C-alpha cells in the first residue's frame, strides 16, 4: 500500500505554492500520495504563517491535535515548515517535542533527506537556513491540477517595514533566474494551464538574471510570459508601491493577457502612519501610481492591504485612510487589526489604543470596501464577461464556476465537465454579496 502524505497550509499564496511543491517533491522522491485525512498519513506537514499572532497560536493548537496520532503510530513523521518554523526554529520542539522535522521556506527542498534522517536516527531534524534560491534547482517539474497555476518568481523581501516579519522569516529578496521562470511557465502551458499567477513577497521587485547575463525586470518578465503559447491570462501578487514602475504600468496598457485587476497594498492613508511603518512612500505617491494605472487601464479593479490600529494611529489618521479608500475606490481588501510581531521594530512602540476602537475602525473600513466592491459587481449585471471556467460550483454540482478578469467569481448553469479549463462567454444576471451569477452564452471547446 502506498504511503500517504497530509499537508495543511496556513497563510498566503506563497505558502500554497510551497505546499504544492512539497507534494511534488515527496511524490517523486518517496512515492508519497497526498491524502485529505491526517489520520491515515505516514507524513504530516504543517506549512505555517506568522503574519498574525492568532495564526501562530493556531500552529500549536493544530500540533496538539496531532499528538495523539503520533502516540498511536510512533513511525508517523510530523514536520513544521513555513514562517513560524523559520522564526521559532528548534524552539518549536519545546512546546511540541513530538515534532520530527522543522524546516524553513528556503529549505523545503531538503525534506526527503530530513524525513529519512528523522526515521533512521529517531532524532529531530532542524534546518531553517537561507540558502538563497537553491530550492528551485532541486525541485521537480510542478504537477498540473487544473487550468490555473502559481509560479514563484522571487523569494523574500528587503523592504523591512517596521511591522513585518517576512524579511526575518523568508530572508531578503532573491529573484529566480529569468529563463527558469519561463521554462516553468512553458511546462505548465504545455499541460493545460491557461492562467498563471506570478508570486513573490515583493513580486514587482523581480530582477532575474537572463542567459546572456542581463538583469530583466518584472515588466519584461510579464511580456515574455504573455508570449508563451497557451497562456491567456496573467495575474501577480504581491506588489509594493515603490516598485510599481512606469514600465510596469505600460505593460498593463499593452499586454492583453494581464488581467484588469491589481493588488497593491498601502496599509494606511496617513503619511504619519506610513512613516512609522517605514513604507518609504507617501499617500500622494501611492495615489499618483493609481492615477497612472487607471489612465492606462480605465476599468481596472484595485484591492489592497490595510492595518488598522497601528501604534499611535489617531482618529484623524483613520479618517485619512477612509478618504484614500473613497478616492481610490478599492473593491476588496485584506484588512486586520495590528498585532505586534516579536523581533520587529514596531513591537517596541507603545500600543495604547483601546481594542474596541480598533475593532470599530476595522468594521467601518471593511464595510465600506465591501460596499464599493458590491457596487462594481452590480454595475456588471447585464454585461457579458469572458470567464475562465475552473471547476464545478462548490454549492451546486449542476453549475460551473469561473473567474472574470477583474477577479469576480461567476457561477452559471452548466453540467458539462469538458468546459472546465476553457473560456466561456457568460451573461451576468445577478450580483450576490461574494459572487456573480450568469447564463452561458458561448464557449470554445478544444
UniProtKB/Swiss-Prot annotation:
InterPro entries: Elp3/MiaA/NifB-like_rSAM (IPR006638), Methylthiotransferase (IPR005839), Methylthiotransferase_CS (IPR020612), Methylthiotransferase_N (IPR013848), Methylthiotransferase_N_sf (IPR038135), MiaB_methiolase (IPR006463), rSAM (IPR007197), rSAM_horseshoe (IPR023404). Residues 3-120 form the MTTase N-terminal domain. Keywords: 4Fe-4S, Cytoplasm, Iron, Iron-sulfur, Metal-binding, S-adenosyl-L-methionine, Transferase, tRNA processing. It catalyses: N(6)-dimethylallyladenosine(37) in tRNA + (sulfur carrier)-SH + AH2 + 2 S-adenosyl-L-methionine = 2-methylsulfanyl-N(6)-dimethylallyladenosine(37) in tRNA + (sulfur carrier)-H + 5'-deoxyadenosine + L-methionine + A + S-adenosyl-L-homocysteine + 2 H(+). Residues 378-442 form the TRAM domain. SMART domains: Elp3 (SM00729). Its EC number is 2.8.4.3. Its cofactor is [4Fe-4S] cluster. This is tRNA-2-methylthio-N(6)-dimethylallyladenosine synthase. It comes from Pseudomonas aeruginosa (strain ATCC 15692 / DSM 22644 / CIP 104116 / JCM 14847 / LMG 12228 / 1C / PRS 101 / PAO1).
